[in-house]
């Protein structure tokens, strides 16, 4: 069985491979602008900015684009005033959806989201309706074929402060507190591992969906991700691996 994490990884790979690459850049630039505005333009003293810049570099964003976005955030260059807004709701089948948006027009974003929720048979809910279902965690991912000694990896991660290790799927996931993410990541990189790290929201419980509901959920989540104002979408669905792959293949076809 797989859930939101597998969907997010598949979606990200497809976006990186096709014409939607520019949409990734748009979202990353907004994140850099807001991170620099809130915590300053120095990546050494601003963890959120450092994480955003690392993501941008991983996507091969040109250096000048990154620097320009930082200057827009610090006010050295004129830029759009983005606000961070959280939206919560339910997808088909009762799946909880937690959305983080960066927008210059909250009314427009709320209207577009309400339209999508209604279109796909979900419902936009009040603040606090589903946030309690999710925990904010640091997640480090390492491709299974890059790990020669799983026991060694686990020891390094645990000694550095990791909370949990999920080694049943690919990539292997190491769970940390948001505060310990940077330390665990650094220790793994010092040991020679190539990792991807992020702060995310992990559901405490999941909702299994199948058939039409499963298709509607994935179609709905894809539509949310395609919105320029939406930075991240989190959900607590769970479905069969094969069914997810078949549905995504049809949707992307």
Curated annotation (Swiss-Prot):
SUPFAM superfamilies, alphabetized: YebC-like
One GO CC term on file: cytosol
One of the GO biological process terms: regulation of DNA-templated transcription
Keyword terms: Cytoplasm, DNA-binding, Transcription, Transcription regulation
InterPro entries listed in its UniProt record: Integrase-like_N, TACO1_YebC-like_2nd/3rd_dom, TACO1_YebC_N, Transcrip_reg_TACO1-like, Transcrip_reg_TACO1-like_dom3, YebC-like
Location in the cell: Cytoplasm
Domain of life: Bacteria
GO terms assigned for molecular function: DNA binding
Family classification: Belongs to the TACO1 family.
Protein name: Probable transcriptional regulatory protein Tpet_0454
Taxonomic lineage from the root: Bacteria, Thermotogati, Thermotogota, Thermotogae, Thermotogales
């Amino acid at each position: 069985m797989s859930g939101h994490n597998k969907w997010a990884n598949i979606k990200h790979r497809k976006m990186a491979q096709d014409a939607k690459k520019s949409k990734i850049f748009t979202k990353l630039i907004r994140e850099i602008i807001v991170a620099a505005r809130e915590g300053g333009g120095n990546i050494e003293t601003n963890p959120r900015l450092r994480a955003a810049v690392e993501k941008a570099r991983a996507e091969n964003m040109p250096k000048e684009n990154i620097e320009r976005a930082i200057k827009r955030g610090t006010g050295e260059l004129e830029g759009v005033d983005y606000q961070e807004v959280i939206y919560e709701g339910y997808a088909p089948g009762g799946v909880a959806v937690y959305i983080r948006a960066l927008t210059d027009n909250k009314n427009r974003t709320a209207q577009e989201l309400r339209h999508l929720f209604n279109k796909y048979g979900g419902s936009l809910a009040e603040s606090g309706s589903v946030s309690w279902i999710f925990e904010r965690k640091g997640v480090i991912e390492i491709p299974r074929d890059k790990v020669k000694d799983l026991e060694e990896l686990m020891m390094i991660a645990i000694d550095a402060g990791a909370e949990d290790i999920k080694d049943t799927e690919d990539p292997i996931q190491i769970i940390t507190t948001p505060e310990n993410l940077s330390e665990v990541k650094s220790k793994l990189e010092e040991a020679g591992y190539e990792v991807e790290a992020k702060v995310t929201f992990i559901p405490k419980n999941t909702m299994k969906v199948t058939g039409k509901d499963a298709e509607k959920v994935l179609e709905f989540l894809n539509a949310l991700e395609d919105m320029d104002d939406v930075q991240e979408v989190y959900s607590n669905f769970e479905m069969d691996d094969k069914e997810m792959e078949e549905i995504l293949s049809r949707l992307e076809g």
